[in-house]
Curated annotation (Swiss-Prot):
<dbReference type="InterPro" id="IPR008991">
    <property type="entry name" value="Translation_prot_SH3-like_sf"/>
</dbReference>
<protein>
    <recommendedName>
        <fullName>Elongation factor P</fullName>
    </recommendedName>
</protein>
<dbReference type="InterPro" id="IPR001059">
    <property type="entry name" value="Transl_elong_P/YeiP_cen"/>
</dbReference>
<dbReference type="GO" id="GO:0043043">
    <property type="term" value="P:peptide biosynthetic process"/>
</dbReference>
<keyword id="KW-0963">Cytoplasm</keyword>
<dbReference type="Pfam" id="PF09285">
    <property type="entry name" value="Elong-fact-P_C"/>
</dbReference>
<dbReference type="InterPro" id="IPR013185">
    <property type="entry name" value="Transl_elong_KOW-like"/>
</dbReference>
<dbReference type="Pfam" id="PF08207">
    <property type="entry name" value="EFP_N"/>
</dbReference>
<dbReference type="InterPro" id="IPR011768">
    <property type="entry name" value="Transl_elongation_fac_P"/>
</dbReference>
<comment type="similarity">
    <text>Belongs to the elongation factor P family.</text>
</comment>
<dbReference type="InterPro" id="IPR020599">
    <property type="entry name" value="Transl_elong_fac_P/YeiP"/>
</dbReference>
<dbReference type="InterPro" id="IPR012340">
    <property type="entry name" value="NA-bd_OB-fold"/>
</dbReference>
<dbReference type="InterPro" id="IPR015365">
    <property type="entry name" value="Elong-fact-P_C"/>
</dbReference>
<dbReference type="InterPro" id="IPR014722">
    <property type="entry name" value="Rib_uL2_dom2"/>
</dbReference>
<keyword id="KW-0251">Elongation factor</keyword>
<dbReference type="GO" id="GO:0005737">
    <property type="term" value="C:cytoplasm"/>
</dbReference>
<comment type="pathway">
    <text>Protein biosynthesis; polypeptide chain elongation.</text>
</comment>
Amino acid sequence: MAERANDIRPGQVLEHNGGLFLVVGIMHTQPGKGGAYIQAEMKNIKTGAKHYERFRSDATIRRAILDEEEYVYLFTEGNIVNLMHPSNYEQITINLDLLGEKKIYLQDNMKIKVVAYQDKIISAHVPDYVTLAVKETESVIKGQTATASYKPAILENGMRVNVPQFIKEEDKIVVYTPGDSYYERVKE
């Protein structure tokens, strides 16, 4: 879809120089001399490399049309992840590398967002919030609760995260996956 460079927003995916680029940030600049331009910070979806591009305000850019579908995680076999569409039960496979470091969060029946461009899968994402059980953590020492302090914990998936002092072993917590950090304790 063609549109003006002035309409670029962070989060959009552009077709540029034969590749797909995710717009990370933009800055509108109006110099004292010459025409206004847009400085865009972009990330190549295929390689992950950052790229800076300058567009004239009236330049035409092409926004990529992406298809997003939600699938349910079934199982992983080697480097292949098997997913199922929840309404038509169609099964697909994706490469484990598409999930990057977030593959550690995979759980049975988890909803995975799959993004495709021209019928080719380009990325997959786990949910932003995942519930996990605390497998191991230090016990609380009385008197250490005067200030908000955190202690290390090992979760059921083997991941380490800092949790508040009141969290005990076997507690279920919600982890914020983009930051790999503690979000809240699950209320039962």
